Curated annotation (Swiss-Prot):
It comes from Scyliorhinus canicula. This is NADH-ubiquinone oxidoreductase chain 2. InterPro entries: Complex_I_Subunit_2, NADH_DH_su2_C, NADH_UbQ_OxRdtase_chain2, ND/Mrp_TM. The chain crosses the membrane at residues 3-23, 25-45, 59-79, 95-115, 149-171, 178-198, 199-219, 242-262, 274-294, 324-344. Core subunit of the mitochondrial membrane respiratory chain NADH dehydrogenase (Complex I) that is believed to belong to the minimal assembly required for catalysis. Complex I functions in the transfer of electrons from NADH to the respiratory chain. The immediate electron acceptor for the enzyme is believed to be ubiquinone. It holds the Pfam family NADH_dehy_S2_C.
């Protein structure tokens, strides 16, 4: 892609997200979401592959539907209350419609149908943007609306997402689909606690973005899109295969890694709110997610790709060294659990 065009596209994505962050008027926020959506479409379609075209079409239709529903919710709220301010959504029907629209935008179950198929049709770089950056603007709105939203509806979306994310990833062999269901499950954890502790949602979102960034960068380095293609990662770089192992276990929420921290704090908060049954269901579904992460760990570090030479490494193998971005994100994804007391102190 032309560097000038790429610069304009990336600047537009940044502008759209910034507008949503700073906006307090519904139309300005909606405009930011639309700029964000339209900016990523050229990146999705640049491959000129039928699967990329299909993924882009699905993404555009889904996001357009969600944007129309969100605009309808804001107009309805302005009609009934006379307020266009983001934090003045006093009409319960408008708040419910806005929640459903934002759930469709980020891919919460049962409105998740588009996310695995779209992510599967994209290359890993664009998939990384879709799984991380494109979540920021909708979550900025959700965090501002959190006191006004229906807690039961958020709980329904959250628990359903953890169930779908856990079960959906079990029989997948495509890495991008596994990461899509992983995203759905993690979004479920975030949205469940949104009404009770927005700061925990923000903490979970930040850690999720770092862990997803590390995972996508590793798969891009290994040039892997299927489970059976990452078995040669140990030959390419033993250090990076160990980083992949630790990051995947952290995504699964295994102690003593960073990914355990938000799950632990969220379950603790749900228990304080006497939501024992949702907390139990989510903890059990986390075990299902951990199972398919363990499958990836087994394929990454405990299997060896078939080859004609019985050697640890061949002269043809290109040496892969982790970059500074990868090392930084991996460190945050793996070693943040001892910082929990400090983070809790900053949050209170």
């Amino acid at each position: 892609m032309n560097p000038t065009v790429l610069t304009i596209i990336i600047s537009s994505m940044g502008l759209g997200t910034t507008l949503t962050f700073i906006g307090s008027h519904w139309l300005l926020v909606w405009m930011g979401l639309e700029i964000n959506t339209l900016a990523i479409i050229p990146l999705m379609i640049r491959q000129h592959h039928p699967r990329a075209v299909e993924a882009t079409t699905k993404y555009f239709i889904t996001q357009a539907t969600a944007s129309a529903l969100l605009l309808f919710a804001s107009v309805t709220n302005a009609w009934t209350s006379g307020e266009w301010s983001l934090i003045e959504m006093l009409n319960p029907t408008s708040a419910t419609l806005a929640t459903a629209a934002l759930a469709l935008k980020i891919g919460l179950a049962p409105l998740h149908f588009w996310l695995p198929e779209v992510l599967q049709g994209l290359d890993l770089t664009t998939g990384l943007i879709l799984a991380t950056w494109q979540k920021l603007a909708p979550f900025a709105i959700l965090l501002q609306l959190s006191p006004l939203l229906n807690s039961n509806l958020l709980l329904l979306f959250g628990v359903t997402s953890t169930i779908v994310g856990g079960w959906g990833g079990l029989n997948q062999t495509q890495l991008r689909k596994i990461l899509a269901y992983s995203s759905i499950a993690n979004l479920g954890w975030m949205i469940t606690i949104l009404h009770y502790s927005p700061s925990l949602t923000l903490l979970n979102l930040i850690l999720y973005m770092f862990m997803t960034l590390t995972t996508f960068l590793l798969f891009k380095t290994f040039n892997s899109t299927k489970i059976n293609s990452i078995s040669s990662s140990t030959l390419k770089s033993p250090l990076m295969s160990v980083i992949a192992l630790m990051t995947l276990l952290s995504l699964g929420g295994l102690p003593p890694l960073s990914g355990f921290m938000p799950k632990w704090l969220i379950l603790q908060e749900l228990t304080k709110q006497s939501l024992i049954i949702p907390a139990t269901i989510m903890a059990l579904m986390a075990l299902l997610s951990l199972f398919f992460y363990l499958r990836l760990c087994y394929a990454t570090t405990l299997t060896k790709a078939p080859g004609p030479i019985n050697m640890a490494s061949t002269w043809r193998t290109k040496s892969h060294q982790p970059t500074l971005i990868l090392l930084t994100s991996a460190s945050i994804s793996i070693f943040m659990l001892p910082m929990t007391p400090l983070i809790l102190m900053l949050m209170t």
